[in-house]
Regions:
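Conserved C-terminal structural/oligomerization subdomain of aldehyde/semialdehyde dehydrogenase
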Residues: 38-44, 74, 231, 266, ...
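Residues at or immediately preceding the N-termini of alpha-helices
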Residues: 36, 50-53, 69, 87, ...
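N-terminal Rossmann-like NAD(P)+-binding subdomain of aldehyde/semialdehyde dehydrogenases
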Residues: 1-141
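Rossmann-like NAD(P) dinucleotide-binding subdomain of oxidoreductase/dehydrogenase enzymes
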Residues: 128-275, 397
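ALDH superfamily catalytic-core signature
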Residues: 241-377, 400, 440
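Structural signal for hydrophobic packing residues in well-ordered secondary-structure cores
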Residues: 61-64, 80-87, 91, 98, ...
Length: 485
């Protein structure tokens, strides 16, 4: 039983510099966590006080990490081994608190191990640069060198519900790799995976002062997390509105904001329709459609639209969903019943405005069926705004110019997918789509845990995540020069 596992592992307590804080508080000072499918409470976490949040920052700020590259790599490699050994436990916890099906939860648990391994490998690389100074007529016989150092203060990390473990990994691992200190606040809807993640790192040998996990009500502690004097950088993944609030509140400190997306898959007239429809369906429904890089708009050339729609409908009907603990199913629930109700209302609104519902839009609690809606117009809210669930809205276009115009016609700019074999089309999409990533004949969300990832416009400020890029964001660069004969 997952409830007993949570108690046995003491996941009902925060981790402030490794210490278990806050278990057993009164109901008024705890947050209940529910299984989205059953609706039953599986545990609770404490509501941190402002004093506890400040203590976490003070401990981090006072501690000066001295881990060598070898020691950091060893810790991350041991953490990878532990997380791999405990993969079934990690996956079961993800599924229980987020409602993700076991297929998706197991995949995410494997990704966490990958992040640990990539982080360990990156630690061993020295990315310093060397500049010879005799490059101009007034140059000198000197060389300028660069080196990266940890931030002077503490990193604040705030993570969302949709990837309870992997989002945490992408914040914490680069922090460990760069000898930084971090205070992590996971989503109050899915806190247990983050606490278990911290325990894995402590077991692997991480000095506990380098990582604290605080849980609580954002209305009480969010401003302190953003504005604490010891916070040198705020890294946040989540919705646009909250990201912009952080940007306005944080003041003179660094920010890495990975926000929402409204990612298209664009299917041209020369595309392999079987391949394109398979990618479209997987991109729309994996992780219950709750990914910033999920397919949220299907843009299809009118010449192949009917064939594409037929295949998408057939593959959607075959996409099994239900109890997330059933390892045979392709999809579990969305995060909670209000989210499912929101998706249902968005689809109903589009249908009332002339779109055609082909399959789905069935809701039971937090369970929401894979849904296909055809003849959607770009101005409908279903596709104008981000619909963060398993909905496949189909928009038909006449040529590449219109496809690019529609794709760029929202406030978002995260990722995209294009299905074509024509190089002239590919080069135009790469050049003209206002997004952070363009994947050819692949889903918008495809990436390695190592590669740069992030968006522009309302999807982010252009800073990238991914282990390599986060390491750069989490460090200060210093130059020094020496005489060189």
């Amino acid at each position: 039983m997952i409830e007993q596992f949570i108690l046995d592992q003491q996941l009902n307590a925060m981790r402030i510099a490794g210490k278990k804080i806050g278990a057993g508080r009164s109901p008024e000072r705890t947050i209940a966590v529910f299984n989205p499918y059953s609706g039953k409470q599986i545990g609770s976490v404490p509501k941190a006080t402002l004093e506890e949040v400040r203590e976490a920052f003070a401990i981090g700020a006072a501690y000066k990490p001295t881990l060598t590259r070898f020691e950091r790599a060893a810790i991350l490699n041991r953490a990878a081994a532990i997380s791999t050994r405990r993969l079934d436990e990690v996956a079961a916890l993800i599924s229980a608190e987020a409602g993700l099906c076991m297929k998706d939860a197991i995949y995410e648990a494997g990704r966490v191990s990958d992040v640990f391994l990539f982080g360990a490998n990156e630690v061993l690389k020295d990315d310093g640069q060397v500049f010879s100074c005799d490059l101009t007529h007034h140059g000198k016989k000197r060389r300028v060198y660069t080196q990266r150092s940890p931030l002077l203060g503490v990193i604040t990390a705030i993570t969302p519900f949709n990837h309870p473990a992997n989002q945490v990994a992408h914040k914490v691992v680069p922090s460990v790799a760069t000898n930084n200190r971090m205070v992590l606040k996971p989503s109050e809807k899915v806190p247990f995976s983050a606490i278990l993640f911290a325990d894995i790192l402590y077991e692997a040998g991480l000095p506990p002062e380098m990582l604290s996990v605080v849980t609580g009500d954002p209305r009480e502690i969010a401003d302190e997390l953003i504005t604490n004097p010891h916070a040198d950088l705020v890294t946040f993944t989540g919705g646009v509105a909250i990201g912009k609030y952080i940007a306005g509140k944080a003041g003179y400190r660094r920010m890495v904001l990975e926000l929402g997306g409204n990612d298209p898959i664009i299917v041209m007239e020369d595309a392999d329709i079987d391949e394109a429809s398979t990618l479209a369906v997987a991109g729309s429904y994996k992780n219950s459609g709750q990914r910033c890089t999920a397919v949220k708009r299907m843009l299809v050339h009118h010449a192949v639209a009917d064939q594409f729609v037929e295949q998408v409908v057939a593959k959607t009907r075959a996409w099994s969903f239900g109890d997330p603990s059933d390892k045979k199913l392709d999809m579990g629930t969305v995060i909670d019943e209000p989210a499912a109700m929101f998706f249902e209302s968005r689809v109903n609104e589009a249908v009332a405005q002339g779109a055609k519902l082909l399959v789905g839009n069935v809701r039971r609690g937090a369970l929401y069926s894979p849904t296909v809606v055809d003849h959607v117009r770009p101005e409908m809210l279903l596709v104008k705004e981000e619909t963060f669930g398993p909905v496949s809205p189909i928009i038909r276009f006449k040529d590449i110019d219109e496809a690019i115009r529609i794709s760029n016609g929202t406030a978002y700019g995260l990722s995209s997918a294009v299905c074509t074999n024509r190089l002239d089309y590919i080069t135009r999409f790469v050049s003209e789509l206002d997004v952070g990533s363009v994947n050819v004949r692949e889903v918008p969300g495809y990436r390695l845990e190592l590669t740069p990832f992030g968006g522009i416009k309302d999807s982010g400020l252009g800073y990238k995540e991914g282990v390599q890029e986060a390491i750069k964001s989490f460090t200060n660069i210093k130059t020094y020069s020496l005489p060189w004969a």
